[in-house]
Amino acid sequence: SFTLEAPTVSKYDDETILIEFSGEDAALLIGKEGYRYKALSYLLYNWINLKYGLNIRLEIAEFLKNQEEMIEKYLVPVIERIRNSGRGQTKILDGVLIKIALESLRAAFPEKYVGIKSGREGGKFIVVNDFNRKNA
């Protein structure tokens, strides 16, 4: 049988609620490559944002926490390069990773333009540069 505890919902901040799934089989909700996580996050966000005007933070078996830690480690040399050259970009990032990286880079560089761009293949990445220049 499938063992999953009832989800807990709590206030994360004034604009965000935290929805947590745990239990022995909670990781099955994440799916291969996080596809189920993305789908569930998308469904919950669209419903809750439309009905209540709130954002969501979905945590399943520490998936989001682990993703945040991984992205923070990845961003260390990226941030260093941007500090040295004044501009830079990330690799192609997917799903929740682009959101986490965007928040981190905006916090690290509040004086710069930090935005999401789409590559030729449709993958998304983040660019950081000065506001007053044409964005490449």
Per-range role (PLM):
Residues 1-136:
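RNA-contacting regions in translation and RNA-metabolism proteins
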